[in-house]
Amino acid sequence: MLFRSEAPKASAKQQTLFATLSDADLLTYGVPAEWLLDVRQATEDTLLTLVDHLPGEAAEALLELATGGKPRLLQPVATVVNPFDHPDAQRRFRVLSNVEELQRALEFPWEKWTVFLHPEQRQWVERDYSGPARVSGSAGTGKTIVALHRAVFLARTNPNARVLLATFSDTLSNALRTKLKRLVSHEPRLAERIDVYAMNAIGTRLYKSHFGQVNLATREIILELLSVASKEVGKYKFSLHFLYTEWEQVVDAWQLDSWEAYRDVARLGRKTRLPEQQRTVLWSIFERVRSGLAAQKLITYSGLFSRLASVLANSKNPPFDFAVVDEAQDLSISHLRFFAALGANRPNALFFAGDLGQRIFQQPFSWKALGVDIRGRSRTLRVNYRTSHQIRMQADRLLGPQVSDADGNVDDRRDTVSVFNGPPPVIHVLKSEKEEIKTVSAWLSEQLKTGVAPHECGVFVRSEAELPRARAAVEDAGVPFKVLDEHVETTSGLASISTMYLAKGLEFRAVAVMACDDEIIPLQQRIETVGDDADLQEVYDTERHLLYVACTRARDYLLVTSVSPASEFLDDLRL
């Protein structure tokens, strides 16, 4: 006997959403016959819980109907067509007819492999979306490649359109630009219509075109203004670190310009509760900072993007027809406001790719509240074809089985499947730096003997202070190398050495993660600067994410080393 969980019942006072639809229509939209009654009773309050129980095509159709859209009725498929080829069948079955194609891809020259799109993911690249869409998934599932191919697809199918391909940092935009060149090197005219930018870089460019010179307030200027204002107000003694994070993550992030706005804002990510009396004093401080910035005609990046959002909201000619955003988990509030205004809920205008487990730079916040509603247009990539099963399984131990955003969208990593095997990661806790250097050197030499090229090797450390250890290991192995800077340009024939902060967007066959010592990761300096015990968890989470990012840069081989005492994170990394 089959059992199904009960869908939530509608309140008698609430209006049902689908009562006027015929059974035939609901069935055509993909609603199973046994769920027809539940769908007819659905209200705004029960719909989101209900669609979790339904097939993907039915959930999408119902969400579009509920928001005023009219989804396309599915047509019967000719019997001569392979039913497994239908997009809705491919949601639930992974027919491994492309194993040979994947095997050939794994044997590609490295430059070609780094832009390979798994055939199963082409549907998300070429899909027609009625509003903002997002693909997510753990490291190795191909999110960046999907975003890259999506940008090219939009430019190719819209010959007069301009496409923005944006990402979090200059480092990542350089990596994306390199991949784009590899992908469309034979189509220069198409490439000219795809602008690849870091977020702050495109913001600065557009701001200059609308308002002229950009005078940015530095961190040092803001700290000085906070210090002076705090002394002037007195009354409560807040640490400068607390004041700066409250300014950065709440006041400036949300562009609060009045006491009422600050009093009423939901302080997501700020775990210390503040009574109204303390908030009143804090606002007196922040008001002085705002006045100080205005007097010096300075602006923050949050202010810059908020002004741009206001301009775009009232413009009929956006600078870009489409925007594709990689590393979307690190978008700020003002970044998302900017994209909401740029996309204006036009079909296909906004496409995001990101992994909540790789969030390093931003506090969580609600996308829906800012006008970017991805319900029904959010997909989790579950086929990992860029990282071996063994590396993925161990790296995932650094994170929980589920990660969620502020809107309740959940990424469940337990359903991810890797499509190829490799040797298990090697973890060594050594007695001295000298022993660690020798161990990594021997490991690198062994990789080269097995056919791994120097440029297919990467060595990562937590920060610049540990770079000499990495350099010594690579030099000892006799491997030519390059220490990456913010341009993150890997060079054929040279191994890459880098800090973990520059690791995003990179991929290597063999990766060594060195210097995972106690007090290095998590970094003791960060822990000591936490002005509030409740913020400590955020430090630990982002430090875990850093190590996760570094480990998942490896496709086939992973070595993790430390000098005793080792980071506590290595206990989690071990099986």
Say what each PLM segment does.
Residues 110, 114, 118-162, 168-216, ...:
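Conserved helicase motor core of SF1/SF2 NTP-dependent helicases
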Residues 3-103:
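N-terminal accessory nucleic-acid engagement/regulatory domains that precede
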Residues 1, 16, 21-34, 177-251, ...:
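Conserved P-loop NTPase-based nucleic-acid remodeling module centered on helicase motor cores
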Residues 96-118:
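N-terminal pre-Walker A segment at the start of P-loop NTPase domains
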Residues 228, 557-558:
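Catalytic/regulatory signature loops of cyclic-dinucleotide turnover enzymes
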Residues 91-94, 252-261, 400-409:
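Proline-centered turn/helix-capping motifs that create local helix->coil transitions or kinks
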Residues 3, 11, 37-57, 209-278:
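ATP-hydrolysis module of ASCE/P-loop NTPase motor domains
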